[in-house]
Swiss-Prot record:
GO biological process: chromosomal 5-methylcytosine DNA demethylation, oxidation pathway; epigenetic programing of male pronucleus; positive regulation of gene expression via chromosomal CpG island demethylation; positive regulation of transcription by RNA polymerase II; protein O-linked glycosylation
Chain residue numbers at which the record places covalent cross-link Glycyl lysine isopeptide (Lys-Gly) (interchain with G-Cter in ubiquitin): 1002
Function: Dioxygenase that catalyzes the conversion of the modified genomic base 5-methylcytosine (5mC) into 5-hydroxymethylcytosine (5hmC) and plays a key role in epigenetic chromatin reprogramming in the zygote following fertilization. Also mediates subsequent conversion of 5hmC into 5-formylcytosine (5fC), and conversion of 5fC to 5-carboxylcytosine (5caC). Conversion of 5mC into 5hmC, 5fC and 5caC probably constitutes the first step in cytosine demethylation. Selectively binds to the promoter region of target genes and contributes to regulate the expression of numerous developmental genes.
Disruption phenotype: Neonatal lethality. A germline-specific conditional knockout produces females that are normal in growth and morphology but display much reduced fecundity in terms of the frequency of successful pregnancy per mating and the litter size. No 5hmC signal is detected in the late male pronuclei of zygotes collected from the conditional knockout females mated with wild-type males. In contrast, deletion of Tet3 from the male germ cells does not seem to affect the change in 5hmC and 5mC.
Substrates-to-products reaction catalysed: a 5-methyl-2'-deoxycytidine in DNA + 2-oxoglutarate + O2 = a 5-hydroxymethyl-2'-deoxycytidine in DNA + succinate + CO2; a 5-hydroxymethyl-2'-deoxycytidine in DNA + 2-oxoglutarate + O2 = a 5-formyl-2'-deoxycytidine in DNA + succinate + CO2 + H2O; a 5-formyl-2'-deoxycytidine in DNA + 2-oxoglutarate + O2 = a 5-carboxyl-2'-deoxycytidine in DNA + succinate + CO2 + H(+)
Compositional bias (Polar residues): 369-380, 543-552, 1393-1403
Keyword annotations of the record: Chromatin regulator, Chromosome, Cytoplasm, Developmental protein, Dioxygenase, DNA-binding, Iron, Isopeptide bond, Metal-binding, Methylation, Nucleus, Oxidoreductase, Ubl conjugation, Zinc, Zinc-finger
Gene encoding the protein: Tet3
Tissue localization of expression: Highly expressed in germinal vesicle (GV) stage and MII-stage oocytes and in early embryos.
Family: Belongs to the TET family.
Binding site for Zn(2+) 2: 69, 72, 75, 84, 1083
EC number(s) reported in the record: 1.14.11.80
Annotated organism of origin: Mus musculus
Protein name: Methylcytosine dioxygenase TET3
Length: 1803
């Protein structure tokens, strides 16, 4: 990018560097209206080494002016070391080459202009651009400008000259009388141009060859100093002749010096900041030009051209000659024989021979063209023309195009830009780059190569032009600055194209610009366009385009007034450019007009200079660009309009445009100039349109253009395309300057102001820019605003490169790195530090992130004033707190958020809180920045109260929690959100958000986006949520706008474009999405994907007990800035007041931050891990389901057999339980049960396969889709049969028996009843097991419960508790008892509800153990339930027996044991399984699980037989999701099947277990574990089948037991987390009961106050306590922020709901980016098609073809997939169910899921 920028930058730099006298600098290369400075030219010729410092003429107005204006860039920025632009000698403003031409006129004032321009442009551009500045100057210099400057010396280029009103017509009117001057110099100018072109070529070579300034004699420096001092004395635009004459120094020496200066050699006393000394460069250029003019005055300047120039830029004779001159350059390219110069150029420039030849041809043509003196000829030889009085006006442009195309033009242009204060070098250059860059710069390289000299370097120069062309373009843009059309010139002329400036000027000022500028502009435009086109073809050109962005510099006069030295502009070019592109208007006139806007970009040209370097390396061969044949006709046509345009000088930017446009040459919009705009915004908006037809026109006009095409057929083709696309009028418009004006607006086509003489060129130039890269193209050819719209999208890129494709969008042809820069939105909004001298270097790491969109000021008092104005209240209403950035994050030992200082609302009077940071070491305008704004009364209280209730109710039931990385510490081991997945803190996302898959909005492919999606199908709830959020967004936006207007504006910029991705009901929608965080602890993070200069707006809603000011609630959540500490003083610097705040509580200083340490037993799995596991689980589940469905009978039989397996506890768990469960499965309707269980628990879980932590499934269950800790929030379960529990758990614990199962009565759900999260507490309260059973199934006693609908069940569950509540057995036994009744009803009801109830029952079933504990209830319930629901079971011992046996172990109570024993005894392994299965399965399984949950259900479940299923349930109960899982797949099945047999089996174990409670539990857990290990093995298939029959999610015993195992392991973690999981496995039920409380106790014991943070005062931790209905605004993208963990998070009744409104940085596409997605899909489809064709060609099968296409991404995986598929096909149907799942499903789901695009259709 820098390379591309370099050319443009060079010009700007030159302007800055060569601002000897400010005025001169302004003129830059275009000292004269278009004349290159004679000295400059000479220097250029000589390579710049021999250039001598030119002297001020002492006669022009600027020279006679003794006081600085104080407003120009030179005055305001003394670093440029440039004399005030208004005092810059007119002579010095002209390039040396121009002076030579102008010397004829220069003496009349033209010379000075030309010389100044030459110097500036030449030196600036030559290093990178190629032609020496003088060459550029001579070619492109606009005599019209010179005319204008006649009074002031060099007004034409003077556009850059602050003093010369004639500059660009801004400083003064173009003088018609100057026309004679120009005319007089016309011949010489032509010669000068030719010389300049040669000089440029030579200079480019020399510049590269020259190693140091050592070659320069100190005498040169002395001369320079003398002249500079003289110039400083007289800033008037006195004639440049004096300077020129001084240029008598050895030309070689001057050229060498120039080359060295351009390479960084500065005079000993130079204090310039830039790499070059703008003044010295300008002076050298002036010298060289003056010498060139002296020696080259003989050069035929197009005489005709001069008069037209006088008449007006439009004068075709002048312009055409220039065009001819330029064009001739092109023709020589075509037929130029390979010469030594060409070879040397090729060698030195490392360019192709063709390019070198083209350059040489251009050089020759430029010199020859001046002779013809017809407009074409002149156009062809812009440099010479620039030298001539008439040429000067156009000359700047021509000169830019021809002489400095390679090197000089950019520099010369910069010189001009610097010379004229109106053209800040940077901005003007960019403008010219845009306007001229498009037209003139391209033309100049082509024309200037031949025109300045036929040296072999012309090609190199041309190439440089490509690289340098951007410089030229810059200079062209600068030139518009210098030109009367200051608008454009201002932006670009100073920096990049002084010559172009004259063109705009001429356009603005009809007299000067009319004829000569017309021709010259045409020639320049043609050349520039051509070159631009080439640049577009090559990356460098794209950069040049960026310079063109600066094409809008104002007239030199305008720029001069700004006083920003043209050379300086490079510093500001980027911004300026962006601004300038808007400035350029449709025509050259418009360009001139825009020039003033461009003015600022003058400085940036210096930066552009860097791009120049890149430009020097033309990516796009100049040869093609040089072809001007096609442009010639356009140039001629454009010429006619030019005169008119010239007659009416457009604004500077427009002037630049008009200059370029004046030249009928079609600008080469397609030329991509990759040069930063002089202003520093090297990139022009990609869509920016630049009209630089003028250069093209010039090329066309010039006969040389014809010859050039032969040099390169492609070039010729390009020219023709330009002609066709741009038409003749393309020369007229000055879009280049316009685009330059708006370089920043990348995809914007800015039409240059239309010149009065020509309609807006249809071929507007499109400027595509990003970062430092700008691409100029003709995409906008036929649309005035074609810029943005014309820019093709990525998807539109042609598969094969074509000229038309390139013209449409050069970006398509950029290399990947460049394209990445252009395509990466983040690159576009890089932070830009303010320019201040407070510190040497801004280090954000030390002073904190820098941003000002929240507000900034020099002092805290200024912030107060600012915020008082914004809020509308004063005094105490606004509270400002100072914070200090330390960079040391405050966090707990586990890496979780803590607070050290808490800022609270102290009184109701306080309305607004602002946190401000003083940037260490700064005392500038942005020394203090606002980092946080908190409006305590952000929304109406009523609205906040309503929102809190609505969101709590809705999200608790239907919310789908989002797993966020910030929810965990770095190790993923903390449980800050809470351990209960049903109540833990969670965040919910709504609105549009980013999708990496779509690379855009996640709704890109959604026909009916559900922005407020909830789980399940709940349109009404979603509508409520939508209304709530939309209303809130509408309510908050105005406040946001009032408190942070800049941030607000940044966020609504693209609202109209991407309104689909915005929230809000009224215009002004700054938000795209909202995240609802409910008791969610967000660990320290930055919202990296938020809009770059946007903010997050957080609306806080708090619990009822935290809505009063002055009261600190028991539990609260704070918003923390971990890297800041509180200042010791208040906003007024008073420590006492600060201490008073602390004592009053307004600031709470903490000495510790005690928080319970909640830790996960093992690190939580990442989203990716969970996804992979989910896929695997889903595949296995499908396989199991298929197997179950396919062989239910077989499974049943196996289940029965398993049930008959040994009753040994271990066996029962493994085999016995499995058998029992299997038998029950058989007895129970497998499908019904399966579906019931499956849908009750697993169905939901599976529906959230991608929920991640939010999954309802058991975190540790193998069967769960995701294996994650229960800590992860689980989505609200779908209502069971329409029943929605108000509890976080699924109604009846879909996934098993969640401890807080909503289905269960609140008493059971309560931590006390269930033992929070399966904690011992619930187990302790086990007595409610029966009650739980009753509540779960009111008909526990009867089978009715199972039959009840889900809602009824839930209701019953809630109510019936008392019935089975008998607390006789507080342990799991009670739960078991209730389970028994449940089992029987559940088994009865095969309906899903039954299944649901069975889940409940299952829990209860497990509770039959409780019945054991409760001898009464168990026998009664068990017998009743067993008998009623399962006669066999009851007979066998009834559920009581079964459960009793099972529960006996867990319960450990003698009663239970006895009962259980009896029951278990009654329940033979085989019988009870059989009986229980039916009812137990549906009921028992679920019941058992729930009951177990309440107790240390795990212990109960651990009971051998039942344990596996019930145990799972119990575990699940501990971890509701687990139960769900088990209930769904494992628990439920296990419950029933295992219940029977396991209970029987577990009788012995269980009885002992019952007796030894904890021991039993241990046994149970151990057996479960063992069973998990064993069972899968012994009865894996049968169990699996049985499970399947039951509809269990587990595919096999392994799965079931695996789930159990995982649960067991998980359970342990759960126990730790929930308080029961850990102990139950190894200890008994009793212990399990204890385990919950124990864990809690342990957790309570594990507290941390993060002492270490409070020992170091520099560790941050400033927190604010957001109040109810408050609105907090902060830049979350830049500031590290966090929210503290709550002591007892419960999202069912959240302590704090924070609604975070934000806008993603890239959600700026209409219709959610559907068009982009479709385009991408088309592209992928095409690729897929190609792959298929390739596969067909290679004879690959369909499968192989798929793999073939995906190999790169999937590698082995893909191969495996095909194999699987083959196996699948080969495998018999009996295996088909499983195989397809494994191979096809697994592979496809896995691999294809990862693949984007066309692959999806292969799934």
């Amino acid at each position: 990018m820098s390379q591309f920028q370099v050319p443009l930058a060079v010009q700007p730099d030159l302007s800055g560097l060569y601002d000897f006298p400010q005025g001169q600098v302004m003129v830059g290369g275009f000292q004269g209206p278009g004349l290159p400075m004679a000295g400059s030219e000479t220097q250029l010729r000589g390579g710049g080494d021999g250039r001598k410092k030119r002297k001020r003429c002492g006669t022009c107005d600027p020279c006679r002016r003794l006081e600085n204006c104080g407003s120009c860039t030179s005055c305001t920025n003394r670093r440029t070391h440039q004399i005030c632009k208004l005092r810059k000698c007119e002579v010095l403003k002209k390039k040396a080459g121009l002076l030579k031409e102008v010397e004829i006129n220069a003496r009349e004032g033209t010379g000075p202009w030309a010389q100044g321009a030459t110097v500036k442009t030449g030196s600036e551009l030559s290093p990178v651009d190629g032609p020496v500045p003088g060459q550029m100057d001579s070619g492109p210099v606009y005599h019209g400008d010179s005319r204008q400057l006649s009074t002031s010396g060099a007004p034409v280029n003077g556009a850059r000259e602050p003093a010369g009103p004639g500059l660009l017509g801004a400083a003064g009117p173009w003088r018609v009388d100057q026309k004679p001057d120009w005319e007089a110099a016309s011949g010489p100018t032509h010669a000068a141009r030719l010389e300049d072109a040669h000089d440029l070529v030579a200079f480019s070579a020399v510049a590269e060859a020259v190693s140091s300034y050592g070659a320069l004699s100190t005498r040169l420096y002395e001369t320079f100093n003398r002249e500079m001092s003289r110039e400083a004395g007289s800033n008037g635009r006195g004639p440049r002749p004096e300077s020129c004459s001084e240029g008598s120094e050895d030309l070689d020496t001057l050229q060498t010096a120039l080359a060295l200066a351009r390479h960084g050699m500065k005079p000993p006393n130079c204090t310039c900041d830039g790499p070059e000394c703008p003044d010295f460069l300008e002076w050298l250029e002036g010298k060289i030009k003056s010498m060139a003019m002296e020696g080259g005055q003989g050069r035929p300047r197009l005489p005709g051209a001069l008069p037209p120039s006088e008449a007006g830029l439009p004068a075709p004779s002048t312009r055409p000659p220039l065009l001819s001159s330029e064009v001739p350059q092109v023709p020589p390219l075509e037929g130029l024989p390979l010469s030594q110069s060409a070879l040397s150029i090729a060698k030195e420039k490392n360019i192709s021979l063709q390019t070198a030849i083209a350059i040489e041809a251009l050089t020759q043509l430029s010199s020859a063209l001046p002779q013809p003196s017809h407009s074409t000829s002149q156009a062809s030889c812009p440099l010479p023309e620039a030298l001539s009085p008439s040429a000067p006006f156009r000359s700047p442009q021509s000169y830019l195009r021809a002489p400095s195309w390679p090197v000089v033009p950019p520099e010369e242009h910069p010189s001009f830009a610097p010379d004229s204060p109106a053209f800040p070098p940077a901005t003007p250059r960019p403008e010219f780059s845009e306007a001229w860059g498009t037209d003139t710069p391209p033309a100049t390289p082509r024309n200037s190569w031949p025109v300045p000299r036929p040296s072999p370097d012309p090609m190199a120069e041309l190439e440089q032009l490509l690289g340098s062309a951007s410089d030229y373009i810059q200079s062209v843009f600068k030139r518009p600055e210098a030109l009367p059309t200051k608008p454009k010139v201002k932006v670009e002329a100073p920096s990049s194209s002084p010559a172009p400036v004259p063109s705009p000027i001429s356009q603005r000022e009809a007299p000067l610009l009319s004829s000569e500028p017309d021709t010259h502009q045409k020639a320049q435009t043609a050349l520039q366009q051509h070159l631009h086109h080439k640049r577009n073809l090559f990356l460098e050109q794209a950069q040049d385009a960026s310079f063109p962005t600066s094409t809008e510099p104002q007239a030199p006069g305008w720029w001069a007034p700004p006083g920003s030295p043209a050379p300086r502009p490079p510093d500001k070019p980027p911004k300026e450019k962006k601004k300038k592109p808007p400035t350029p208007a449709g025509g050259p006139v418009g360009a001139e007009k825009t020039t003033p806007g461009i003015k600022t970009s003058v400085r940036k040209p210096i930066q552009i200079k860097k791009s120049r370097s890149r430009d020097m390396q033309p990516l796009f061969l100049p040869v093609r660009q040089i072809v001007l044949e096609g442009l010639k006709p356009q140039a001629s046509e454009g010429q006619a309009p030019l005169p008119a345009q010239l007659s009416v000088p457009p604004p500077a930017s427009q002037g630049a445009a008009s200059q370029s446009c004046a030249t009928p040459l079609t600008p080469e919009p397609s030329l991509a100039l990759f040069a930063p705009s002089p202003s520093g915004d090297s990139l022009l908006p990609p869509t920016q349109e630049m009209r630089s037809p003028s250069p093209m026109v010039a090329l066309q006009s010039g006969s040389t253009g014809g010859p050039l095409p032969p040099a390169d057929d492609k070039l010729e083709e390009l020219i023709r395309q330009f002609e066709a696309e741009f038409g003749d009028s393309f020369g007229l418009p000055g879009p280049p300057s316009v685009p330059i004006q708006e370089p920043e607006n990348q995809s914007t086509c800015l039409p240059a102001p239309e010149s009065p003489f020509a309609t807006r060129s249809p071929k507007k130039i499109k400027i595509e820019s990003s970062g430092a890269v700008t691409v100029l193209s003709t995409t906008c050819f036929h649309s005035e605003e074609g810029g943005q719209e014309a820019t093709p999208t990525k998807a539109e890129n042609p598969l094969t490169p074509t000229l038309s494709g390139f013209l449409e969008s050069p970006l398509k042809y950029l290399d990947t790195p460049t394209k990445s820069l252009l395509d990466t939105p983040a690159k576009k909004a890089q932070s830009e530090f303010p320019t201040c001298d407070c510190v040497e270097q801004i280090v954000e790491k030390d002073e904190g992130p820098y941003y000002t969109h929240l507000g900034s000021g020099p002092t805290v008092a200024s912030i107060r004033e600012l915020m008082e104005d914004r809020y509308g209240e004063k005094g105490k209403a606004i509270r400002i707190e100072k914070v200090i950035y330390t960079g040391k994050e405050g966090k707990s030992s586990r890496g979780c958020p803590i607070a050290k200082w808490v800022i609270r609302r102290h009184t109701l009077e306080e309305k607004l809180l602002c946190l401000v940071r003083h940037r260490a070491g700064h005392h500038c305008q942005n020394a203090v920045i606002v980092i946080l704004i908190l409006a305590w009364e952000g929304i109406p209280r009523s609205l906040g109260d309503t929102l809190y209730q609505e969101l709590t109710d809705t999200l608790r039931k239907y919310g789908n929690p989002t797993s966020r990385r910030c929810g965990l510490n770095d190790d993923r081991t903390c449980a800050c959100q809470g351990k209960d997945p049903n109540t833990c803190g969670a965040s919910f996302s709504f609105g549009c958000s980013w999708s990496m898959y779509f690379n855009g909005c996640k709704y890109a492919r959604s026909k009916t986006p559900r922005k407020f999606r909830l789980t399940g199908d709940n349109p009404k709830e979603e509508e409520v949520l939508r209304n709530s959020f939309q209303d809130l967004a509408t309510e908050v936006a105005p406040l946001y706008k009032r408190l942070a207007p800049q941030a607000y504006q940044n966020q609504v910029t693209n609202e109209d474009v991407a309104i689909d991705c915005r929230l809000g009901l009224k215009e002004g929608r700054p938000f795209s999405g909202v995240t609802a965080c409910m008791d969610f602890c967000a660990h320290a993070h930055k919202d990296q994907h938020n809009l770059y200069n946007g903010c997050t707006v957080v609306c806080t809603l708090t619990k009822e007990d935290n809505r009063c000011v002055g009261q600190i609630p028991e539990d609260e959540q704070l918003h923390v800035l971990p890297l800041y500490k509180m200042a010791s003083t208040d906003e007024f610097g008073s420590e006492e007041n600060q201490n008073a705040k602390v004592s009053s509580g307004a600031i709470q200083v903490l000495t510790a931050f005690p928080r319970e340490v909640r830790r996960l037993p093992e690190p939580a799995k990442s989203c990716r891990q969970r996804q992979l596991e989910a896929r695997k689980a889903a595949a296995e589940k499908k396989k199991l389901q298929k197997e179950k469905l396919s062989t239910p009978e077989k499974i049943k039989q196996e289940a029965l057999e398993l049930a008959g397996v040994t009753t040994d506890p271990g066996l029962s768990l493994k085999g016995g339980l499995s058998q029992q469960s299997l038998k029950p499965s058989l007895k129970v309707e497998p499908q019904n049960h399966f579906s019931s269980f499956k849908y009750s628990g697993n169905a939901v879980v599976e529906s959230y396969s991608v929920l991640g932590s939010c999954r309802p499934s058991d975190p540790y269950s193998m069967s769960s889709v995701y294996s994650y800790h229960s800590r992860y929030a689980q989505p609200g379960l779908a209502s069971v049969n329409g029943f929605h529990s108000k509890y976080t758990l699924p109604s009846f614990g879909y996934y098993g028996f969640p401890s807080s199962n909503p289905v269960f009565p609140s008493q059971f759900l309560g931590p006390s009843a269930w033992g929070h999260g399966g904690s011992g507490g619930s187990f302790e309260k086990k007595p409610d097991l029966h009650a739980l059973h009753n509540s779960l199934n009111p008909a526990y006693g009867g089978a009715e419960f199972a039959e009840l609908p889900g809602q009824a069940v839930a209701t019953d569950n809630h109510h019936p508790i008392p019935h089975h509540q008998q607390p006789a057995y507080p342990g799991p036994k009670e739960y078991l008892l209730p389970k028994v009744p449940q089992l029987h009803p559940a088994s009865r009801d095969p309906s899903p509800f039954a299944q649901s109830s069975s889940c409940y029952n299952r829990s209860i079933k497990q509770e039959p153990i409780d019945p054991l504990t409760q001898a009464e209830s168990i026998p009664r319930d068990s017998a009743k339930m067993s008998r009623t629901p399962l006669p066999e079971a009851s007979q066998n011992g009834g559920p009581s027996h079964l459960w009793g046996q099972y529960s006996g172990g867990p319960s450990m109570s003698p009663k239970r044991t006895n009962s259980v024993g009896g029951n278990w005894g009654v329940f033979p392994p085989g019988e009870s399984p059989t009986i229980v299965p039916d009812k137990l399965n549906s009921f028992g399984a679920s019941c058992l699980t729930p009951s177990h949950f309440p107790e240390s259900q795990w212990g109960l479940f651990t009971g051998e037989g039942q344990q596996s299923a019930p145990h799972a349930g119990a575990r699940l109960r501990g971890k509701p999701w687990s139960p769900c899982k088990f209930g769904n797949g494992t628990s439920a099945l296990t419950g029933p099947s295992l219940t029977e047999k396991p209970w029987g089996m577990g009788t012995g174990d269980f009885n002992p277990a019952l007796k030894g409670g904890p021991g039993f539990q241990d046994k149970l857990w151990n057996p479960v574990k063992v069973e998990e290990g064993r069972i899968p093995t012994p009865g894996a298939n049968p169990l699996d089948k049985a499970w399947q029959a039951f509809g269990m999610p587990l595919s096999s015993n392994e799965k079931l037991f695996g789930a159990l195992k995982s649960e067991e392991k998980l359970w342990d973690p759960f126990s730790l987390e929930e308080g029961t999981a850990e102990e139950p496995p190894s200890k008994g039920v009793v212990k399990e009961e204890k385990s919950g409380p124990t864990v809690e106790e342990d957790e309570e014991e594990l507290w941390s106050d993060s002492e270490h943070n409070f020992l170091d005062e520099n560790i941050g931790g400033v927190a604010v306590a957001p109040a109810h209905c408050s609105i907090l605004i902060e830049c979350a993208r830049r500031e590290l922020h966090a929210t503290t963990p709550l002591k007892k998070p419960n999202r069912c009744h959240p302590t704090r709901i924070s609604l975070v409104f934000y806008q993603h940085k890239n959600l700026n596409q209409p219709n959610h980016g559907l068009a982009l997605w479709e385009a991408k899909m088309k592209q992928l489809a095409e690729r897929a098609r190609q792959r298929q064709e390739e596969a067909a060609r290679l004879g690959l099968g369909q499968q192989e073809a798929k793999l073939y296409g995906k190999k790169r991404k999937w590698g082995g995986a893909m191969v495996a997939e095909p194999q699987h598929k083959e196996k699948k096909g080969a495998i018999p149907t009996r295996q088909a169910l499983a195989m397809p799942t494994d191979s096809a499903v697994t592979v496809s789901s896995y691999a294809y899921t990862k693949v984007t695009g066309p692959y999806s259709r292969w799934i």
